[in-house]
Amino acid sequence: MKLPRSSLVWCVLIVCLTLLIFTYLTRKSLCEIRYRDGYREVAAFMAYESGK
């Protein structure tokens, strides 16, 4: 089954938006995401500055 290119773009866009909305609803910030298990912790931070 081969999707047309425009359908593929829409599918990827919908998946990305769904992940962003889910992350926003379950976390207090989109700028910090942490994952912890028994032995490891992975943290991703987004740093940004205003261009003013």
From Swiss-Prot:
Coiled coil: none annotated. Belongs to the Hok/Gef family. Induction: Part of the flmC-flmA operon; the antisense antitoxin RNA flmB of this system overlaps the ribosome-binding site and first 3 codons of flmC on the opposite strand. This is Stable plasmid inheritance protein. Its main location: membrane. It is a single-pass membrane protein. GO terms for cellular component: plasma membrane. It comes from the Bacteria. It comes from Escherichia coli (strain K12). Keywords: Cell inner membrane, Cell membrane, Membrane, Plasmid, Toxin-antitoxin system, Transmembrane, Transmembrane helix. It holds the Pfam family HOK_GEF. The gene is flmA.
